[in-house]
Amino acid sequence: MKKTVLALMFSCGMVASAFAHNHAVEHKHTGEMLEVKVELLDPAKGNQEIGKVVITESAYGLVFTPELKNLTAGLHGFHIHQNPSCDAKEKDGKLVAGLAAGGHWDPKNAGKHGYPWSDDAHLGDLPALAVNQDGTANNPVLAPRLKHLDDVKGRSLMIHEGGDNHDDHPAPLGGGGPRMACGVIK
């Protein structure tokens, strides 16, 4: 009898878990959203599409849900940049990937890098993007100071090679490293 009850409880738990998972996936992107096509930046060989990031509004701020592949595992700096371009641009005689995106979006002229919830930092500062060991990224990121989709339209979404310490020290702009992937927010 105990085995039957345990088996029944296990089966019910599995069904409930599957239902909850499917229910969450079905309602993940309800309502208004922005889909941002993201490309791995390579000015020499041409950019390669690696997926998308879906941006939605929530009661807690904008949610950035990545559906990306072919990235290096680990944490990456993740920001909204000023200009709606992912093009390479020349700087000091060298072609720099994604430089046409400009700097971090800073409409309040804070003039410094910081945490996504800091009132005295760029509005474009997002939480770091976590990339799984298999090179995929699918964990949502919440930007609590950004409330409306219209606020980010006409900008670009940038992924940097390294992590982000959310400070200008010891390295400027969180020490995130070169621009690795980008998408224009339309």
From Swiss-Prot:
Keywords in alphabetical order: Antioxidant, Copper, Disulfide bond, Metal-binding, Oxidoreductase, Periplasm, Signal, Zinc
> What cystine linkages occur within this chain?
86-182
Q: How is the cofactor bound?
A: Binds 1 copper ion per subunit.
Annotated signal peptide:
1-20
Q: Name one GO molecular function term.
A: superoxide dismutase activity
What family, per the record? Belongs to the Cu-Zn superoxide dismutase family.
Job of this protein: Destroys radicals which are normally produced within the cells and which are toxic to biological systems.
User: What protein name does the entry list?
Assistant: Superoxide dismutase [Cu-Zn]
Gene for this chain: sodC
